UniProtKB/Swiss-Prot annotation:
Gene3D superfamilies: P-loop containing nucleotide triphosphate hydrolases. Its main location: membrane. Its EC number is 7.6.2.-. This is Nod factor export ATP-binding protein I. CDD domains: ABC_DR_subfamily_A (cd03230). It comes from Paraburkholderia xenovorans (strain LB400).
Length: 304
């Protein structure tokens, strides 16, 4: 593998008058899990399309597995596995047949395809479903099959768009466990996700983008420390604006989202004492997390 598995350098992309990606730069090291986070319309999908050579950038440089994109996208994609946001499995085939057919797309012989199926079924924990139709699988099983299919060519890099969207918590945790096993084997993962817990658990580093521009980058723990840096008390009740004014002298800063007041505190005791006098309020005291960072950077009303 080259020094960087993925390189984006000052990449721009517009559609008509709308700039979708605006000078975006990031790199992903071999063996790293790197997350792209951003609200809907931030440019994440366009970024992935350019990385795979499906869309050409208007400016900037892209390299995937050391290959210039889009000029040598076909060569690079031979070393890449892709997990799309929505499962595109063939419903007319069994679990085993979906893997066999996909292997032939990479020029593998019939014998090679047959040999790679058992370990992939074991990886996806689908051994007992090898001859089941796709329509017979649960959502979590379909997602694990899609992940196994992306590994048919033993790729160096996995590109995953919202890998656990629509899954229940148990299925989501199983996917996370499988992804951690891939990282332990030295695979490189680039993923987009709306689940902040997913990003915090899996990603070594993150890039937060909004309107096609990078607004923050770093390790999850470092971003939490730099952007939040203290505990959070969520308060649920009537008139959050009046409550904000009441508590302002006791907290570092506040944010309002709907009917919820977020108080950022270094010393929580004075706030707790005040809240205990208010039977009409419910509250939760917790450590800051990546969701606080994401919402602060991309869209919640901030009050200093």
């Amino acid at each position: 593998m080259p020094e960087a598995a993925i390189e984006f350098d000052k990449v721009k992309k517009s559609y008509g008058e709308k700039t979708v990606v605006d000078g975006l730069s990031f790199h992903v090291a071999p063996g790293e899990c790197f997350g792209l986070l951003g609200p809907n319309g931030a440019g994440k999908t366009t970024t992935l399309r350019m990385l795979l050579g499906i869309a050409a950038p208007d400016a900037g440089t892209i390299r995937l597995c050391g290959e210039p994109i889009p000029r040598r996208a076909r060569v690079a994609r031979a070393r890449v596995g892709v997990v799309p946001q929505f499962d595109n499995l063939d419903p007319d085939f069994t679990v085993r047949e979906n893997l066999l057919v996909f292997g032939r797309y990479f020029g593998m012989s019939a014998a090679q395809c047959r040999a790679m199926v058992p370990p992939l079924l074991e990886f996806a924990r689908l051994e007992s479903k090898a001859d089941a139709r796709v329509s017979e699988l649960s959502g979590g099983m379909k997602r694990r099959l899609t992940l196994a299919r992306a590994l048919v060519n033993d790729p160096d890099v996995l590109i995953m768009d919202e890998p656990t969207t629509g899954l229940d918590p148990q299925a989501r945790h199983l996917i996370w466990e499988r992804l951690r096993s891939l990282l332990a084997r030295g695979k490189t993962i680039l993923l987009t996700t709306h689940f902040m817990e997913e990003a915090e658990r899996l990603c070594h580093r993150l890039c937060v983008i909004e309107e096609g521009r990078k607004i923050a980058e770093g390790a999850p723990s470092a971003l939490i420390a730099s952007e939040i840096g203290c505990d959070v008390i969520e308060i649920f009740g009537p008139d959050p604006v009046a409550l904000r004014d009441e508590l302002a002298p006791l907290v570092e800063r506040t944010e309002i989202s709907g009917e919820t007041l977020f108080c950022y505190v270094i010393d929580a005791q004075p706030v707790h004492a005040r809240l205990k006098q208010r039977a009409d309020l419910r509250y939760l005291h917790r450590p800051a997390n990546l969701e606080d960072v994401f919402l602060r950077l991309t869209g919640r009303e901030m009050q200093d």
